[in-house]
Amino acid sequence: MKTKILSLANEEVGEITLNKDIFAVEFIRDDIIKQVIDWQRAKAMFGNHKTKTVSEVSGTTKKPFKQKGTGNARQGSLRSVQMRGGGISHGPKVRSHAIKLPKKVRKLGLIHALSEKYAEEKLLIIDSLKLDKPKTSILVNLLSKFQGQSFFVIDGNKVDINFSLATKNIYNTLIVPQIGANVYDIIRHEYVLLSQEAVSFLEERLR
């Protein structure tokens, strides 16, 4: 399956053969894409939320007043959950939110996400993801030729430092090395730009 290779100026500079089993799956499985995104987002959660229980709250263990004769409801501790400044009952605890997902499904998610972008003609192969200067204005001018609102750029083994610095001030533009290709960022950005090195890596990784 042949497709165009473009320059950053959106000019055709050649052709590349893509593996249709990775970049052009016939039936897009949105359910698999959603499963992988849920897995990614759950894994990214810190899970460091925590409230103190009765046994962890600082304070005295002395009974606040005698059991009988005050007219008040009986109380055993100032740290009880019903007291101001007391412990929290059934509050959140530090835990991992990560869920298990088979590696095969994670691979399929990436394949179907790439295929979806290709079907929408929003997956583009770029001949070179390098800039002479780390100037945001230069990159904004180049990306404007693609008429997109957001870009997920997947470079080769190493990201060009000038390109990376130039993206810092551009809203909704992200560049990652080839190992950083992921379903969530592919789906949430309008355009996906791949270097030729990234294409080779993904075909090797997902075959």
Curated annotation (Swiss-Prot):
Residues 56-75 are annotated as: Disordered. The keyword Transferase does not apply. Part of the 50S ribosomal subunit. Gene3D superfamilies: 3.40.1370.10. This is Large ribosomal subunit protein uL4. It comes from the Bacteria. The keyword Ribosomal protein applies. GO terms for cellular component: ribonucleoprotein complex; ribosome. One of its GO terms (biological process) is translation. GO terms for molecular function: rRNA binding; structural constituent of ribosome. Belongs to the universal ribosomal protein uL4 family. Coiled coil: none annotated. One of the primary rRNA binding proteins, this protein initially binds near the 5'-end of the 23S rRNA. It is important during the early stages of 50S assembly. It makes multiple contacts with different domains of the 23S rRNA in the assembled 50S subunit and ribosome. Forms part of the polypeptide exit tunnel. InterPro entries: Ribosomal_uL4, Ribosomal_uL4-like, Ribosomal_uL4_dom_sf. Pfam families: Ribosomal_L4 (PF00573). Keywords: Ribonucleoprotein, Ribosomal protein, RNA-binding, rRNA-binding.
